[in-house]
Design a protein with these regions (language model features):
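Hydrophobic/basic alpha-helical segments enriched in Actinobacteria
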Residues: 10-17, 32, 52, 63, ...
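Conserved active-site alpha-helix within GNAT-family acetyltransferase domains
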Residues: 106-140
Length: 149
């Protein structure tokens, strides 16, 4: 799928086109949710993703990205989504969320996202605070599979 946007931008879900270095740099250096995430972990997550969507500028370079983790039985999680600073303020984040959540193979599923700063953006796509029964378990690095005997 390639979807063309105004201003020469386009969205593409071809995983071979994703600039892994650009994704790693943003997640590791700039994001609040994945700060200092190791490169091998980023690569593992990209390989295991249900869907990757790249946002590309007029020059063809990656300028935004989303990663979906999905269980086709009924749940999709919007794990990483960003638009690089020079490209913000043009509605590109809205289009990236729309492509990720409302189009593609997981559009019909229940979606979850965890965000500290984009509640209004996600509310435009029907995201609401979860029901009170939703529970979360914090990450347990001590139980990471690579550390088990």
């Amino acid at each position: 799928m390639i979807r063309r946007l105004d201003g020469g931008y386009e969205l593409d879900d071809d995983p071979a086109r994703i600039d892994v270095e650009a994704v790693f740099r943003f997640l590791h250096d700039e994001s609040y949710w994945a700060k200092n995430r190791p490169r091998d972990r980023v690569e593992e997550q990209l390989a295991a993703a249900g869907r990757l969507v790249g946002l590309y500028g007029p020059d063809g370079a990656l300028c935004g990205f989303s990663r979906t983790v999905a269980n086709v039985q009924g749940l999709a999680y919007l794990a990483d989504l960003f638009v690089l600073a020079p490209h913000r303020g043009r509605g590109l984040g809205v289009e990236l969320v729309r492509e990720t959540v409302e189009r593609g193979p997981y559009a019909h599923l229940r979606w979850l996202v965890k965000t500290e700063d984009a509640q209004e953006l996600y509310a435009r796509f029907g995201f609401e605070p979860p029901e009170e029964r939703l529970l979360e378990r914090a990450p347990r690095p001590d139980l990471h599979a690579s550390r088990q005997p």
